From Swiss-Prot:
InterPro entries membership: ClpP, ClpP/crotonase-like_dom_sf, ClpP/TepA, ClpP_His_AS, ClpP_Ser_AS
One annotated GO molecular function: ATP-dependent peptidase activity
Known function: Cleaves peptides in various proteins in a process that requires ATP hydrolysis. Has a chymotrypsin-like activity. Plays a major role in the degradation of misfolded proteins.
E.C. number: 3.4.21.92
Protein name in UniProt: ATP-dependent Clp protease proteolytic subunit
GO biological process: protein quality control for misfolded or incompletely synthesized proteins
Species this protein is from: Pseudomonas fluorescens (strain Pf0-1)
Assembly mode: Fourteen ClpP subunits assemble into 2 heptameric rings which stack back to back to give a disk-like structure with a central cavity, resembling the structure of eukaryotic proteasomes.
SUPFAM superfamilies, A to Z: ClpP/crotonase
Primary gene name: clpP
Length: 211
């Protein structure tokens, strides 16, 4: 059950020339092998790795819902290393994070850019983290369309609507004003982990686990 949930992530890693480690566990019933991501899922750890797109978003949402059904009162830990991607795919993850009962703690490892940064900031208050050398980038949504002038106008209005919605939610989660978010996302805005904390995108920069 767990193994199938990470087919896409595993394929991405293998395509990059790596292999997904397997973990063998001993029990009274004998040995059982898990890929490392499936084993971590048993510990309520989810990895969001790579571009945010529909297939990956569906897997993330399914895992969030599954872990809620397993235990609605225990935190879920979402680790993010993403350059961003589809707004609609990202919003499906965002809505599911807000919908389920467990708190979703978010941690940036590597990078959280664009939609990745949005999801990082959407974690439960007080439970949003970055590792010290992570990079965070926020900007306005990107879009392009070709066709008749009337259709281009329709899509331009949709992009403006999406931008306003994302900015409003970012302001809500970061504690910044809407005007500040609009100004600071006008162009690509890269931040260190400490700068992301000062801006309100995360709560803490963590160097190591508490003793």
């Amino acid at each position: 059950m767990f193994r199938n949930s990470y087919i896409q992530q595993n394929s991405d890693i293998q395509a990059a020339g790596g292999l997904v480690p397997m973990v063998v566990e001993q029990s009274a019933r004998g040995e059982r092998a898990y890929d490392i991501y499936s084993r971590l899922l048993k510990e309520r750890v989810i990895f969001l790795v790579g571009p945010v797109e529909d297939y990956m978003a569906n897997l993330i949402c399914a895992q969030l819902l599954f872990l809620e059904a397993e235990n609605p009162d225990k935190d879920i830990h979402l680790y993010i290393n993403s350059p961003g991607g589809s707004v609609t795919a990202g919003m499906s993850i965002y809505d599911t994070m807000q919908f389920i009962k467990p708190n979703v703690s978010t941690t940036c490892i590597g990078q959280a850019c664009s939609m990745g940064a949005f999801l990082l900031t959407a974690g439960a208050p007080g439970k949003r983290f970055c590792l010290p050398n992570s990079r965070v980038m926020i900007h306005q949504p990107l879009g392009g369309f070709q066709g008749q002038a009337s259709d281009i106008e329709i899509h331009a209005k949709e992009i403006l609507f999406i931008r306003e919605r994302l900015n409003t939610l970012m302001a809500k989660h970061s504690g910044r004003t809407l005007e500040e978010i609009e100004r600071d996302t006008n162009r690509d805005n890269f931040m260190s982990a400490e700068a992301a904390k000062e801006y309100g995108l995360i709560d803490e920069v963590i160097n190591q686990r508490p003793a």
